[in-house]
């Protein structure tokens, strides 16, 4: 087994295979739902619209590009994030996708000075962590494709 991605903390839990299968389209394709009654879009997928309480929803794929709204850089390793190894700093951002949906996601493979509010980002598929049964969990992160600063009022 390769030691390229060694874990610092042993994971005592493993994600449910059934749950992982059910959530795969959201995790890998940014698939959410759109309400057929009021047109509201949601991510992750929902069974009931949070705007009008309708159950008449359809699956929709959100765009893989968006704009950073807010940035949080964590320089301290915390015990809450088991299985993430030495990924310091952890850069969490609030991203508004091009269709208006807002999500929380990490930014990776980008110089710190380019991770600012208003920067354009694009989704990439990355290894997140290794489960206790030695399988890899994949998911989405974002990389900066254009710099920028939000103007006043954003």
Q: For the regions a protein language model found, what residue spans apply to each?
A:
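Short nucleic-acid-contacting surface segments enriched for D/E, G, S/T with interspersed K/R
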Residues: 109-122
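OB-fold/S1-family single-stranded nucleic acid-binding modules
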Residues: 126-154
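Residues immediately within or flanking Cys/His clusters that coordinate Zn2+
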Residues: 29-32, 46
């Amino acid at each position: 087994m390769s030691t390229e991605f060694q874990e610092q903390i042993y994971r005592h839990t493993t994600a449910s295979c059934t749950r992982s299968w059910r959530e795969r389209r959201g995790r890998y394709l940014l698939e959410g739902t759109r309400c057929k009654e009021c047109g509201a879009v949601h991510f992750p997928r929902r069974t009931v619209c949070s705007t009008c309480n309708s159950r008449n929803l359809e699956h929709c794929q959100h765009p893989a590009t968006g704009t950073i709204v807010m940035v949080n850089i964590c320089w301290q390793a915390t015990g809450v994030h088991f299985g993430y190894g030495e990924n310091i700093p952890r850069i969490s951002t609030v991203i508004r996708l091009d269709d208006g949906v807002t999500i929380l996601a990490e930014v990776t493979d980008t110089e710190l000075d380019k991770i600012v509010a208003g920067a354009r980002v694009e989704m990439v598929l990355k290894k997140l962590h290794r489960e206790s049964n030695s399988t890899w969990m994949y998911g989405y992160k974002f990389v900066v494709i254009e710099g920028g600063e939000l103007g006043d009022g954003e």
